[in-house]
Amino acid sequence: LVGSEMCIRDRYKGVDPQLSLDMLMRLQTKAPDDNRISKELADVYYTMGQYGKAKEAYESYLKVGTPTEQDYTRYAMLLYLNKDYAQSSDMAKKGLELAPENHVLKRLAMYDNLELKDYKEGLEAAATFFSNPGNPDYVYLDYVYFARLLEADKQYDEAVAQFDKALAMDKSHTEIYKDISDVYEKERDFPKAIEAYKNYLGGMKGDPDISDLFLYGRLNYYAATDSAYQDKQPLYLAEADTIFAQVAAKVPDNYLGNFWRARVNSLRDPETTQGLAKPYYEAALSILEQKPDATKSVLVECNSYLGYYYFVKEDYNQSKLYWNKILEIDPGNETATKALQGIK
């Protein structure tokens, strides 16, 4: 009876997975020791995208069954999708012992090792996976994972080349430009990092979110602070100031927009003679002082600037107010202590 019902189930497996699933559940009630049902359940759950249940069914089957190449492939993929990268890697290795040329298993070996941060093994797996460049089954994400392995190994030029291959394969994935920007930033090649980030922002279908804007502004700020690009510092500072102003306007209860505008304008006024950063440090401080968990170093920076600003303006009482605030936050702060001694 079970055998004939399994045949009927096979007819509906691809047409109506839910019907197939219902039949298998009834079969399992009738024959709970028939391990074939666990495997079939795993296949149906996999088809339906219910990966957690498919994983459980495969685990039940593999306890007593003899896995095939397809079993290893699907189970390793399920484990990967469930973020169980170590076990997925183990299954991929076992599957490759059975089927050394299995394309999906070779892919998973590379993907899993990246997630496990085993970059040496990952690069070896990538070399195996890409050993047949004419294979038509590569997808853009394969090049992304390879690029990230190379980036982790500090092979930055080759990483960018692989990210470029991913984009060439599928230009719709403009988020890859952000990866490229990150690589250039690590190399401190800020002009290229900024160009790539602009491409990332330009490829968005909607408006960029606050974190994307903030990171773009910060990238311009870092470029402005790098001595290699001092000829372009005014341009980078102007762009950073514009972006951080947008951040401050979009999230007025968050200190970051004003705080980074303060840093930008402090660079524009290195002697603090104009007080360009003053209104932004004040705005950031007014927000931070309402937060019990505010970062100490950020509070110290805001108060330090304002203390020094009033010192330059010879408003010593106001200057002392800010230096004393620092000592309330950080009693051992040497800069504040020396500043107060100097005012006396």
Predicted regions and their residues:
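Short, small-residue-biased leader/transition segments that mark boundaries at the very start
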Residues: 1-8
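Residue-level recognition of tetratricopeptide repeat
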Residues: 9-10, 43, 77, 111, ...
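Short coil turns that delineate tetratricopeptide repeat
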Residues: 32, 66-67, 100, 134-137, ...
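TPR alpha-solenoid repeat register
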Residues: 4, 37, 71, 105, ...
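Canonical tetratricopeptide repeat
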Residues: 4, 40-44, 74-78, 108-111, ...
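Canonical positions in the second alpha-helix
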Residues: 26-27, 60-61, 94-95, 128-132, ...
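Register position in tetratricopeptide repeats
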Residues: 13-14, 47-48, 81-82, 115-116, ...
